[in-house]
Swiss-Prot record:
Name listed for the protein in its UniProt record: Anamorsin homolog
Chain segments carrying region Fe-S binding site A: 177-191
Recorded GO MF terms: 2 iron, 2 sulfur cluster binding; 4 iron, 4 sulfur cluster binding; electron transfer activity; metal ion binding
Database matches in InterPro entries: Anamorsin, Anamorsin_N_metazoan, CIAPIN1, SAM-dependent_MTases_sf
Main location: cytoplasm
GO biological process: iron-sulfur cluster assembly
Motif mapping: Cx2C motif 1: 215-218
Binding site for [4Fe-4S] cluster: C215, C218, C226, C229
Spans annotated as Linker: 132-167
Species name: Aedes aegypti
Classification of source organism: Eukaryota, Metazoa, Ecdysozoa, Arthropoda, Hexapoda
Keyword Cytoplasm applies: yes
Length: 254
């Protein structure tokens, strides 16, 4: 009876036939000041219609291995209330495991196969708000401007550009290639230097590819020219005179 205190509401559950020992235990409970006792048979407790969290203590003379009974009694006691099982046939380890699975905490075993389980300090299905953010420190408004503050210096947009910045650039001033002294186009040249150098290269190739006379008599006329002479069919010309040959004349007949 050490589990029952003054002003407690107690549910006493008996199993089998009522004996003199049961009557004595109930009378001892009623002798405690302001203790209200409800006596119920184990086969009827689930049908009695008790409200959840109605009792402070439940004294159950029933097998503790009954999972359905243990879960039902857990609902009947108030948070932090206790359910005391007295089961002579119980196995200590099996009883402890069953009470844990039913939702009890702080399970203890006493002499005489008595097992005590406590209901957690909350109701089934209850919720609690978790404060994970903590106290957020106030951040100084560094970029906040006061429109009424005349001490703030503002930049004049007209002073951002000089007169030199307003002059329209020319193609030569925008050219990046060849500014280091050596005329060399960049990899992705877009200023026109690459095309200019390519044209110069082709011009020098044409100049170097001008045919030269091996016999030295080409200028005299066809009578003195070889069968493969590029000047064949052309009139005689002065020695050293520059003669422009067409593409067809530069190709071999065979």
């Amino acid at each position: 009876m050490n589990f029952v205190q003054e002003n407690n509401h107690v549910l006493y559950i008996w199993n089998g036939a009522i004996s003199g020992e049961i009557e004595q235990e109930v009378n001892r409970l009623k002798a405690i000041p302001n203790v209200q006792v409800n006596v119920e048979n184990a086969d009827r407790v689930l049908l009695a219609g008790y409200t959840p969290s109605q009792f402070d203590v439940v004294l159950a003379n029933v097998p503790s291995g009954n999972s359905e009974m243990a879960s039902s009694l857990l609902k009947l006691v108030k948070p932090k209330g206790k359910v005391v099982f007295k089961d002579d046939s119980a196995n200590a380890e099996a009883t402890r495991s069953n009470l844990l699975l039913s939702g009890f905490i702080n399970i203890t075993s006493l002499d005489g196969n008595v097992f005590v389980g406590e209901k957690p300090n909350y109701e089934i299905g209850s919720a609690a708000k978790l404060s994970l953010g903590g106290n957020k420190a106030k951040v100084a408004a560094v970029w906040k401007l006061d429109v009424d503050d005349d001490d703030d210096e503002r930049i004049d947009e007209d002073e951002l550009l000089d007169e030199e910045d307003k002059v329209k650039p020319t193609a030569e001033s925008l050219r990046v290639c060849g500014t280091t002294g050596k005329r060399k186009a960049c990899k992705d040249c877009s200023c026109g230097l690459a095309e200019e150098l390519e044209a110069e290269t082709k011009g020098s190739a044409v100049a170097n590819s001008e045919p030269k006379s091996s016999c030295g008599s080409c200028y005299l006329g066809d009578a003195f020219r070889c069968a493969t002479c590029p000047y064949l069919g052309m009139p005689a010309f002065k020695p050293g005179e520059k003669i422009q040959l067409t593409d067809t004349q530069m190709r071999a007949d065979i």
